[in-house]
């Protein structure tokens, strides 16, 4: 007997339809799965066998062959347990083929027949809806993801026996209700810029970074507030749109970072990996490529604290910095394997922080630096030029003065700063509408020439400093992009000399 059911797996950040073909024939009892299954899929034989038996359902004691198509796509994870079990029941005659038709099944089977939660269900549901499927069956543990997608009926059977009863119309399940999240907005979280004392220049730099999507390097002594400032950047970024919310929630679903309580990622991500993070954990990778910290920071902030310390033995930072410029430039991480080449989104703001020297006190007003010149030079050379070239704003973070620390005057709140950022982003949204560009930092050369018109005085100033400081062509373009953002914050159509002066200061204030 032959039967066909449908399941799904995850490929990159999207679902991929899998055809599950089951053939039961005479011969010595056996259970084979073909079609490039990984270890987890091969192990489903024992899970399916035990689940059927412990659910009071018949497991055929004959030869069973399961084919997972397309055969050239590697299947990983345990989400195919459920369609395999339904396929066996259909081929054995316990279910009719029409009872399983027009439905997609996703879930891992426990040995007692219950259906366990799996990662990546949200992109699977979205794929099913986009390709015309009307029904999908997922674990109850993934119900929160099922409530996010309308236009398709999502069912959550607790067990295999409950699913069979529903398919036979003996006991009907109710599709999940849909939630409305279009009007939900995230707050500013538990931290706020109003808590930051002093550091007006750095706060201004972060406001410009948020408004234009620019990358930032902060250099300062230990305890100067670099980490505190970086953690408050997401609180001034614009609220995410519905599409951005769904996109980042998809990524977190694939990474297994959603739970029953957290069904939507409403706040922009802030990721801060330790400097011992592996290359594949940072960029993404693995034998079956999975998203790394760069992709988990999509639509948000990636913070690399103590940047030179990422260069632990093995030269890992050099490996990373040879790969980081590509996603920073393109907004996409591409990972190539023998079976396939996968792309993960990586449109983010990179915030980095470091000490000015190994001891941390070079230029400090209180402590004396104990480093030798060659030690300082070696410390700075740990960070590659290509990465530094793509950091638009490089700003010094001075030690906080006692008077600033004890000042009881509350600074501007994140909400106030965010309102200015949102207004500037609105100007950019209108400017780049339909182009695929979201903010000034992403402009290409053609857009730079079109939208960044400098007044004569601004042009003269930029030319003067370009020659005096020996700036590169890329640095020139990035200064102009930052100046464009400053002009947007001030509501100016043209880029003025004051905008160029501030952009140059933000780029060149840190001595390298």
Q: Where is each model-derived feature located?
A:
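Short beta-strand elements
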Residues: 18-24, 282, 392-395
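Short loop/turn elements that form and flank the Walker-type P-loop nucleotide-binding site
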Residues: 59-62, 99-100, 132, 150, ...
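Walker A/P-loop
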Residues: 217-259, 330
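P-loop NTPase nucleotide-binding/switch module
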Residues: 171-208, 212, 239-295
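Basic, amphipathic alpha-helical bundle interface domains used for macromolecular binding and assembly
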Residues: 40-45, 58-60, 67-77, 288-289, ...
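Walker B catalytic acidic pair
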Residues: 299, 305-307
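Peripheral, non-AAA+ core regions of ATP-driven protein-machinery
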Residues: 1-217, 221-227, 476, 482, ...
